[in-house]
Amino acid sequence: MKVLVTGGGGFLGQAIVRQLLARGDTVSAINRSAYPELEALGVTCHRGDIADAKAVMQACEGVEAVIHVAAKAGPGLYAPDFVAANIDGTQNVLNACGEHGIRYLVHTSSPSVVHGGGDIDGGDESLPYPDHFAAPYPATKAEAEKRVLAASSDNLKTCALRPHLIWGPGDNQLLPRLIEKNRAGRLRVPAPEKLIDTVFIDNAARAHLQALDNLTTSGTAAGKAYFISNGEPLPVYDILSRLLEAYGETPRVRTVPKSVAMAVATVVEGIWRVLKKRSDPPLARFVVEHLATAHWYDLSAAKRDLGYDPEVSIAEGLERLAAEVGVTAGGTG
């Protein structure tokens, strides 16, 4: 099958591309930057921004399915950037699918689209979208997901996946930021005992292929969203510490009262808004909410409809992570 992966040069995108190639699919990708490593694998690479309707239209020509991974993530407060990438970009993909008669679309969403600031203990896909969001990222991802699911039809079967806190070898986002804050002594969590679930990169990528396979066969996933994680919820402190130790770092995780963290975040956000800064604030309410609440999910729907079953456990994933940097589990090597 000819598959276009938007954001194919990113952490998740590259993992999906490699798995598609491994099973014999013909793969193309659209990215804002050049990725010679993808071209070396035989991937047809298109340069362009997902918010550029013309670029997306051209990239979608001649493909049979799209896996839409490209997005702007983070706790930033400058809404126009998130609207352009996450809402307009997704609409561009939907329009291009319609124009070119593409039959299948798998959209990478986020569990944050249903996180309203409270605990989510084993929540399933019946969770509603909240009325208010703490940041533009979850708000725009929720709108994008709604559009994708609403567009599902006999002509274009769509579904959305909500992978949670993706990590693993090659991560250039979550883990580097975690290490930076730890080394600076700024890694503080409001509720270290709260359970959260994460997902290893290979499991997250494979779920996208399984979703595509469902759409091209039974189609039972069409018009639906699915939580994707490892199914191994752990206390916030434990998972942060184990990720740091896999990199040979000594965890310096500290506790801070939620009320204090939220008050500081509110002040910082106020300054960021006054200055109209487009960069991520050093502390944001969106981040505090996620570190102060439980969020792990019932994977029954993904297992039933997609055949999803995380192959790589957290323990094995940590071993692979340690091997990437030449560290033996639990310390430097």
Report the location of each language-model feature:
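A conserved pocket-lining segment of Rossmann-fold NAD(P)-dependent short-chain dehydrogenase/reductase
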Residues: 128-131, 180-203, 210-211, 215-222, ...
